[in-house]
Amino acid sequence: MFSAQQPGPPPPNQPGAPAGLMSTPPGAKNPSSTLVDDLESSFEACFASLVSQDYVNGTDQEEIRTGVEQCIQKFLDVARQTECFFLQKRLQLSVQKPEQVIKEDVSELRNELQRKEALIQKHLTKLRSWQQVLEEINGQHKKTSEMPQGPLAYLEQASANIPAPMKPT
């Protein structure tokens, strides 16, 4: 869905703002707003369109759908621009300080190893408990197989489990 849509050119820099973070879309009310501000306002507009009093009062369903879709599309466009900005900054960082990127990669790999080790330990614990259950079942099976297997074996086994009557004193 998103792969066919190419992000637009990066927003122009404005004095006094972090490079590239300023956004001046055509027709914008606030020319000094940042991408983050635009993202926040478009996100709020998505919710505002859903709870608008016009929609509650019974406006045409197609009109509601169109308005919501426009708000969501604007939010997605600004989100793509913001993502593009951060990807550009990440690329600049990787060119200027490649050791920092390597440190981050090593840290991520260590965290992944710790997570996987914990998962292995969890599975080993479960495996040991199931092995114990199987050993108990095998032990019970061996006890029953040691019992005599004659025609009266069932009665002998059942009577072995009945406690002897107590003698009155």
From Swiss-Prot:
Q: What does this protein do?
A: Component of the Mediator complex, a coactivator involved in the regulated transcription of nearly all RNA polymerase II-dependent genes. Mediator functions as a bridge to convey information from gene-specific regulatory proteins to the basal RNA polymerase II transcription machinery. Mediator is recruited to promoters by direct interactions with regulatory proteins and serves as a scaffold for the assembly of a functional preinitiation complex with RNA polymerase II and the general transcription factors.
The cellular component terms of Gene Ontology attached to this UniProt record, alphabetical and capped at eight, are: nucleus
- Indicate the principal place this protein occupies in or around the cell: nucleus
Q: What is this protein called?
A: Mediator of RNA polymerase II transcription subunit 28
Q: Does this UniProt record's set of keywords contain Kinase?
A: no
Where does this one sit in the cell? Nucleus
Region described as Disordered: 1-35
Q: Which family does it belong to?
A: Belongs to the Mediator complex subunit 28 family.
Its keywords, alphabetically, are: Activator, Coiled coil, Nucleus, Transcription, Transcription regulation
Look up the domain of life of the source: Eukaryota
Where do the coiled-coil regions begin and end?
99-137
Q: How does it assemble?
A: Component of the Mediator complex.
The keyword Cell division appears for this protein:
no
One Pfam match: Med28
